[in-house]
């Protein structure tokens, strides 16, 4: 038997927030005039996102007087510090992750006390003692479980977690490895009105996903993996810890850079994955244009992105958790048979 993803559990905080409501909050927070308001509305309508989730209720409030996290004034001053945002992460992340873990374990009919390894993935918050320890306490995971934390690797970090899980199971076939991604992206809203923040504020939502990896004859078998760095995009995407939350650099050129980079890698993909025979793709839903550019670079039909587009539509970009949301939909889809190439 091979190592397989036997179940994936998902969770989102609160009720879905319509993209139009978030746009209204952004207009208020950025103090936009009529023309800039129309530009922002256009961007949000064309995002491919209908709903997002957040641990912060403020994004669906109509008046600043109703805010509970941000200051109750139009300038949002004083703007919440990184410390204040991490306090929310510490309070909310474990509960959200717990829901995803319980869903994954229930699907697989596996008890928490039988887990041997726990891998926590997040790029939107850090605390010690960590979220993984709180999960152990809440779920009854043994104190002897081997713990790993993958922090600050961004949207592709779940791939790193799954690769680690596969290697652990191959090293010890009795292993039961739980990979947990929890991302509270909306904690890091930035009010400065620039291109980076405009794009980031329009895309990201909160969510958690848990994948159980073990030897099994059922599930998504992990067959192979590949990691390549596209140095051309080094200055177009970055994630740094600032004084007022984590700060993102997110260039509008990323989709075209991905298109160019993937075309260069096509021969390598053929050699590594027998690419021309692959019929199903799980592409990280980083944004509508990213999905389109990857689709065009590979010469794929629009239908291959249907699950990724639905995750984007209903949840936005949840960083590392997003690809697990896509794989969960594919795991439940009986029409998908054969190999899946996942990309992030």
Residues covered by each model-derived region:
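Claisen-condensing/thiolase-fold acyl-transfer catalytic domains that form or cleave C-C bonds
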Residues: 98, 123-124, 142-144, 149-170, ...
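Short beta-strand segments
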Residues: 7-9, 121, 151, 176-183, ...
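Short coil/turn connectors at secondary-structure junctions
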Residues: 1-2, 112-116, 143-146, 171-177, ...
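Acidic-glycine-rich active-site phosphate/pyrophosphate-binding loop
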Residues: 126-141, 179-190, 235-239, 291-305
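Condensing-enzyme catalytic core mediating Claisen C-C bond formation in acyl metabolism
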Residues: 1-88, 176, 185, 189-260, ...
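Phosphate/pyrophosphate-binding loops at sites that engage ATP/ADP/AMP, CoA/4′-phosphopantetheine
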Residues: 100-115, 263-279, 298, 330-334
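Glycine/charged-rich beta-loop-alpha catalytic/anionic-binding loops adjacent to active sites
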Residues: 80-81, 113-117, 139-151, 191-196, ...
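Hydrophobic alpha-helical hairpins/lids featuring a short glycine-rich hinge
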Residues: 77-119, 123-125
């Amino acid at each position: 038997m091979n190592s397989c993803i036997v179940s994936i559990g998902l969770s989102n905080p609160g009720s879905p927030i319509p993209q139009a409501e978030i746009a209204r909050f952004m207009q208020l927070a950025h103090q936009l005039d009529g023309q800039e308001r129309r530009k922002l509305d256009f961007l949000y309508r064309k995002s491919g996102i209908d709903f997002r989730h957040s641990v912060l209720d403020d994004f669906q409030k109509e008046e600043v007087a109703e805010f509970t996290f941000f200051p109750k004034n139009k300038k949002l001053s004083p703007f919440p510090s990184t410390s204040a945002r991490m306090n929310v992460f510490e309070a909310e992340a474990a509960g959200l992750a717990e829901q995803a873990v319980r869903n994954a374990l229930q699907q697989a009919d596996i008890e928490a006390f039988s887990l041997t390894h726990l891998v926590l993935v997040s790029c939107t918050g850090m605390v010690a003692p960590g979220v993984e320890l709180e999960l152990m306490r809440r779920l009854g995971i043994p104190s002897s479980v081997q713990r790993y934390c993958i922090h600050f690797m961004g949207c592709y970090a779940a791939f790193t977690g799954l690769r680690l899980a596969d290697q652990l199971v191959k090293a010890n076939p009795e292993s039961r490895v739980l990979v947990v991604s929890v991302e509270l992206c909306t904690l890091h809203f930035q009010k400065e009105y620039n291109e980076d923040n405009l794009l980031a504020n329009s895309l990201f939502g909160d969510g958690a996903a848990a994948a159980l990896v073990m030897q099994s004859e059922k599930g998504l078998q992990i067959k192979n993996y590949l990691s390549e760095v596209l140095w051309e995009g080094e200055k177009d995407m970055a994630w740094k810890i600032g004084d007022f939350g984590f700060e993102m650099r997110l260039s509008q050129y990323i989709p075209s850079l991905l298109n160019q980079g993937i075309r260069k890698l096509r021969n390598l993909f053929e050699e590594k994955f027998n690419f021309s025979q692959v019929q199903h793709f799980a592409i990280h839903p980083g944004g509508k244009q990213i999905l389109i550019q990857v689709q065009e670079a590979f010469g794929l039909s629009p239908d291959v992105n249907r699950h990724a587009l639905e995750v984007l539509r209903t949840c936005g970009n949840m960083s590392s958790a997003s690809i697990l949301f896509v794989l969960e939909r594919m795991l439940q889809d009986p029409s998908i048979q054969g190999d899946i190439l996942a990309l992030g």
